[in-house]
Regions:
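Short, contiguous alpha-helical
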Residues: 34-76, 127-183
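Acidic interhelical loop/turn segments
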Residues: 26-37, 107-138
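An N-terminal domain-cap segment
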Residues: 2-45, 58-60
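A glycine-rich beta-turn/hairpin centered on an aromatic-Pro dipeptide
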Residues: 167-211
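Acidic/His-leaning functional-site neighborhoods
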Residues: 203-229
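C-terminal interaction segments
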Residues: 222-275
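Short, helix-capping/interhelical loops that line the mouth of catalytic, cofactor-
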Residues: 1-9, 58-115
Length: 275
């Protein structure tokens, strides 16, 4: 593989997760593909369709021309409509069609990775006609694929890979979103701090500090007098941050100390993945 060193971790994480997805869905019988997942509105088939569709876009394939039905309750934004096209166009595909297409995409993307010579700053297409760097694209595919692997594992009752390479990509990306959640969305007061303490397969303690101008930043140093401390396990953190559960559903798995109103506001805005 000739991929640039700064892309290697993302390529490895993506490979690990998409191969796990292929292994998870290979033995499924037809009815199991229709099972609902924690991803709002999507079945097992829908998640695999989404993964396939996003990989075809990384390959530069043209998007399908397809009109969405009007009764999809979970489609509430332009971004969601964009994502739904690759899903809805495959809603009536059979199990063998799904596994065959996934296998073919894996082969094509693996070949692309082997021959990858573009720089991390190379600009590629992004959803909704936007642009992103190749590094951003690789990072987001590693993130997305691991999160959907976990959706499938929850649905199929096959837990695992909570500490795989993809998990670390997800951790870093979610942590980057914390300052906005705390300082802007939840409105934490100026010159305050919020501590997030996560245990389990992926462990970390981070402090979000809000400066005198109300801007947030995150670091690994503990705070002596935080306004709020949130403690939870890694799986719950991911499910909250990715909008798979509401705070009330996992209240027994999140320990809150300090300002209860601020903690509630933070948890209400904790989901950062687009919908």
């Amino acid at each position: 593989m000739t991929v640039h060193p700064s892309l290697q971790n993302y390529a490895d994480a993506w490979t690990h997760s998409i191969e796990a997805i292929a292994e998870l869905v290979q033995p499924l019988v037809e009815g199991e593909w229709n099972r609902a997942t924690p991803c709002p509105g999507w079945s097992v088939r829908d998640i695999v369709s989404h993964v396939i569709g996003m990989e075809t876009e990384m390959l530069g394939d043209p998007r399908p021309i397809h009109s969405l039905p009007r009764d999809l309750y979970h489609v509430r934004s332009d971004f969601a409509r964009y994502m739904e096209v690759q899903v809805d166009v495959r809603r009536h595909h059979t199990a063998p069609e799904m596994t065959s297409e996934l296998e073919y995409i894996l082969i094509r993307r693996a070949r692309q990775l082997r021959n990858e010579s573009r720089s991390p700053e190379h600009v590629i297409r992004a959803p909704l006609g936007a642009e992103q760097t190749l590094e951003q694209g690789y990072r987001l595919r590693a993130f997305d694929t691991w999160v959907h692997e976990q959706d499938l594992r929850v649905t199929l009752g096959t837990p695992g890979n909570l500490d795989s390479p993809g998990a670390l990509v997800v951790r870093d990306l979610l942590l980057e979103a914390l300052p906005k959640v705390v300082a802007k969305d939840a409105g934490a007061p100026a010159s305050s701090a919020v501590v997030v303490d996560v245990t389990g397969p992926v462990e970390f303690l981070r402090t979000v500090r809000v400066d005198a101008e109300g801007r947030g930043s995150v670091d690994g140093a503990p705070s002596l007098g935080p306004a709020v401390t949130l403690a939870t396990d890694w799986e719950t953190y991911v499910r909250l941050a990715c909008g798979r559960v509401r705070p009330a559903e996992v209240a027994d798995r999140v320990k809150v100390e300090g300002d209860q109103d601020l903690a509630e506001a933070i948890l209400d805005h904790f989901a950062v993945t687009p919908n």
